[in-house]
């Protein structure tokens, strides 16, 4: 059974309202970033890594429960390498390794061996943070170039505006959730991976709509551009909602049952996909409408403003 077939919802009729609404959301996101700065993870602010192994089978859930007794905020635990090998990251460069070692000694006595202890200085963490920002920026530029070549340059600009909107709004919501204590979300490599995934997902959603717009420009040449865009959104609505709903369903399961390791990434994806679906319909498409109708009307009345060919 297929849903949302042959719909005729006026998505573009209230585009000015959604433009203002989205602008307000972006302003709020920027203000939150300034006054509620994010908590950087060990990857970006420095810390210590302790790698160790057990000579018996140990559940990572039990190990995490024991390590939490050290009361180290921002502690990260994951398995690596062979069986019963684990890696702990702590933000406390000097005292963190000793706290972890003491807890392991109390809980497991001589049943573990320390493989290595590495320290990540603040300078290295800062360099990694800058590289992560460059990764996000280059991803946006690559997406714009791809869409510009596949469609037109204006479509690439519309996609970039939507992506920037997605990142700012998603980031703002995450800051609120973190500072309210609902989830402990840090800006680390997993966070950046989540943002990049959101960027790719948002662009994919936008490309589907843009592709239908291009098809309908050939099929409905006499139709007003705004109505043609609205038709394209309605025609792709079923695919958009079904894809978003199924993805969100999986993410909800990961948020509640994926454990601390996957919870943050899944939540970022959850928020980002909802925001990205919204921006594909109400941001990217509306910019293309503005460029092809309202902007051209203004230039027609004021030829001196035609600085963009």
Segments (PLM) and residue ranges:
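A structural signal for conserved, well-ordered secondary-structure elements
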Residues: 1-309
